[in-house]
Amino acid sequence: MIMRMTLTLFVLVVMTAASASGDALTEAKRIPYCGQTGAECYSWCIKQDLSKDWCCDFVKDIRMNPPADKCP
């Protein structure tokens, strides 16, 4: 539960910074777990025990492409 709250807060901070700079992709690549692909971000997100839908939305929010076989 604490991990989810921490991750949510972290994502909000990153997305706020990304909105301010106008470049979410650049900001997302500064997050160590995102790597270079949407699949890497999705994989990391799932390992945090977050829902499939939440992870799909997260990857899309940072302007990366989630894995097509996992996200509709």
Curated annotation (Swiss-Prot):
Keywords: Cleavage on pair of basic residues, Disulfide bond, Neurotoxin, Secreted, Signal, Toxin. Transmembrane segments: none annotated. GO terms for molecular function: toxin activity. One of its GO terms (cellular component) is extracellular region. Residues 23-28 form a propeptide. Disulfide bonds join 34-41, 45-55, 56-71. Its main location: secreted. Expressed by the venom duct. It is found in: Secreted. Residues 1-22 form the signal peptide. The keyword Ubl conjugation does not apply. The keyword Chloroplast does not apply. The cysteine framework is XXIII (C-C-C-CC-C). Belongs to the conotoxin K superfamily. Neurotoxin that induces excitatory symptoms in mice following intracranial administration. No symptoms are observed after intraperitoneal and intravenous (tail vein) injections. Negative results: does not affect (up to 50 uM) the Nav1.7/SCN9A channel, Drosophila Shaker channel and rat KCa1.1/KCNMA1 channel expressed in HEK293 cell, as well as on whole cell current of neurons from neonatal rat hippocampus and prefrontal cortex. In addition, no detectable effect is observed on either action potential amplitude and duration or Na(+) and Ca(2+) current amplitude and kinetics when im23a is tested on action potentials and depolarization-activated Na(+) and Ca(2+) currents in rat DRG neurons. This is Conotoxin im23a.
